[in-house]
Swiss-Prot record:
Species per Swiss-Prot/TrEMBL record: Solanum lycopersicum (Tomato)
PANTHER family, alphabetized: S-ADENOSYLMETHIONINE SYNTHETASE
Principal subcellular localisation of the protein: cytoplasm
Name by which UniProt lists this protein: S-adenosylmethionine synthase 1
Residues binding ATP: H15, D167, G168, K169, S235, G236, R237, F238, D246, R252, K253, A269, K273, K277
Expressing tissues: Mostly expressed in stems.
Amino acid sequence: METFLFTSESVNEGHPDKLCDQISDAVLDACLEQDPESKVACETCTKTNLVMVFGEITTKAIVDYEKIVRDTCRNIGFVSDDVGLDADNCKVLVYIEQQSPDIAQGVHGHLTKRPEEIGAGDQGHMFGYATDETPELMPLSHVLATKLGARLTEVRKNGTCAWLRPDGKTQVTVEYSNDNGAMVPIRVHTVLISTQHDETVTNDEIARDLKEHVIKPVIPEKYLDENTIFHLNPSGRFVIGGPHGDAGLTGRKIIIDTYGGWGAHGGGAFSGKDPTKVDRSGAYIVRQAAKSIVASGLARRCIVQVSYAIGVPEPLSVFVDTYGTGKIPDREILKIVKENFDFRPGMMSINLDLKRGGNRRFLKTAAYGHFGRDDPDFTWEVVKPLKWEKPQD
């Protein structure tokens, strides 16, 4: 049997880029909670002892941006300079302007257009992907890397591994076989974890705790064998982390946010963007379409692309590829997709309830992936039953 290796990485919520994603989405939540028509394009950057929030926001909401920044940093665990950032004492800069009136008139007519008339907030192309290799209909390499990162945070916050600090990265290499276009995981080839830690812990203790409390609870035993390679803090020392170790910026972890390198990506980031930004809403609807195709038995693996022009409601193109795993021709599946999904931005906002903020709704998406999550707030993960007739043998 011919096999190949494929690798996906993740970072946890204390990584400086992910910190920025979470602040941007916390701002979005605050705006949408008070004003569902808020137009938000919120960027965040961070470095030692500094967080800056900047962008274009038009909203009736009363938002305390500095409080959102400090609360988000504190909740992640950035509570002192020792761990990379002190939420209560760092410098917070806010540079927010209104949305460009040129964009406003072209996209939503200064809030006068009906939902079906609202145009895309920008040009672009987005991809959705699904595969039957996991219950989440997501790639196993990505699922495992993401869950390892989430588990790192869990054992840090519950005190199981008190030596952990907020920043950390994970990476998983899976050996696969190709079953006529479908991906079949065989085993985990390599597990890599680099996690920030305090001064007191030894490398041996780090390796032992990571295997016992992070890897074993996350990776099913059937995928591990005596040949699985473990690289656990291979650099030997990771005390300085968070914004103290590296600068952070919103939108720099777009592959981690999506499919771990599988499928494709149009390049647009998600966090800090309201649903008129099709970078986000378009990617959500095509994930729902791809997932529904696989869940309905139309294919074992699928990618869906949609594209837009700024100010134009209807998509320019919709594309489906099932990698040869489709039960009926891809052109027939494309027809089913177009009949069942409304790709107009205003209608996507309604059908996926994307104007509802608050309660950490979008903040939750900003760490540990936007897809494959079992959470009712992730409305794009709800499978739409697709009716089709199996061809006669």
